[in-house]
Amino acid sequence: MIQKTISETSPPPMFSDEEILTEDEIEEYLDNLKSKLPSFVIILLKNNLRGKRVTKKQLDKIVERITEVLSKGRRDDKTEELNKKLQTLEQKLDAIMKLTTMAVSTKTSEEIEKIKTNEKIEIENAPIKIKSEEKPEKPVEIEVSKKKETMDTGKKTETEEKVKEIEVPKPVEKTHEKVEETKTKGEIKKEVKKEVKLKKYELPKESPMGGSFMTPIEEEKEYRLNDIPEDAVSMTLVFKWLEFLISRGGMTYLPDILDYYNKIGWISNRVILKLLRFAKNMKITFDEEELRPRDKLSPSDHIVSLLYIEKLAGRPIDSEILEMLEIEIRRIKKWAIELQSI
C-alpha cells in the first residue's frame, strides 16, 4: 500500500533529451513550429520522420539546420537573377542564329527570281526590234518594182510623182514612231512617277491657323526599311519580329517603340502602319514576372530588332557581327560566374 501511494503521489516522469520520441510527440513538436517555419516544410518533415527513431536533440538540430538554410536562401536571390539573365542572353543568341540560317536560305531564292526577271525583259525587248527593222523595207521594194514595169515613155511625169509618194510610205513612219514610243515609254513613266510622288508629299507653307509646318517630307529621308515585301519568307520574319517586340514591350508600348525607330531613321511611316495592322489580332501571355512588358527596351533588344530590319530590307548580315555578339555574351557569362564565386 505504501508503494502504491508513493507511486500515485509522485509526479509523472519527464522525458529526457536522449529518449526516443513517439510519432504523436513528433507531430506535436512540429505543430508548435508553425509560426517559425512554413507549412510545406513541416509537412515534409512529418513525412520523412515517420517510422524513424529520433530524440529531441536530433530534432532540435534538424530544425536549426532548416532555419539556417532558409536564411541563406534570401542571400542567394542575386545568384538566381544572374542565372535568369544568362538564360535570356542564350535565347537571344538562338534567335540571331535562326536569322542567319534564314538569310542563307533566302539568298538562293532571290538569285533565281533575278534570273527570271532578266529573261522576261530580254523576251519582251526582242520582238520590238524585229518589227522595226523588217516592216518598212518590204512594201517599198514591191510597190516600186510593180510601177517600174507599168511605166510608159509618154507618162514619165505621173510615174515620177507616184514613185515620190511611194518612197516615203506612211507605214514606215508609224513603225518608227512605235519604236521611238516604246523606247521613250520607260523614260516618260519614270518622269511622271517622280512628279506624282512630289505632288503627293508636298505640304502647305502655312497652316490654316496662321502657323507654318516644320515637319520634313518623308521622301527626303532615307530609311533602312522603306516598305515590307509581301513574299512568304519576309512575312514570317515580320510576325517573328512582332512576337519579339510584344513579348518585350506589350501591345501598349508597341507604337512608342516603332515611333522611336522612325525617329532614328530605321523604318518609314508606311512600315509602321503595316506592322500595327498585323499586330491587331496577336496575343501573347506572360507567365513569369520578369517577362512582363516594359516601356523601354534594352540595347541588346534593339540590336535584335536591327537585325530583323536589315534582313527584311534584303541586306545580308555579316558573320563578323554575330561573332562579336557571341564574344560579348561570353564575357558577361564569365563576369557572372566570378560574382557567384565571391
From Swiss-Prot:
InterPro entries: Arch_fla_DE, FlaD_prd_arc, Flagella_assembly_related. Its main location: other. It is found in: Archaeal flagellum. One of its GO terms (cellular component) is archaeal-type flagellum. GO terms for biological process: archaeal or bacterial-type flagellum-dependent cell motility. Transmembrane segments: none annotated. Pfam families: Arch_fla_DE. Keywords: Archaeal flagellum. To M.voltae FlaD, also to FlaE. PANTHER family: FLAGELLA-RELATED PROTEIN D-RELATED, FLAGELLA-RELATED PROTEIN E-RELATED-RELATED. This is Putative flagella-related protein D.
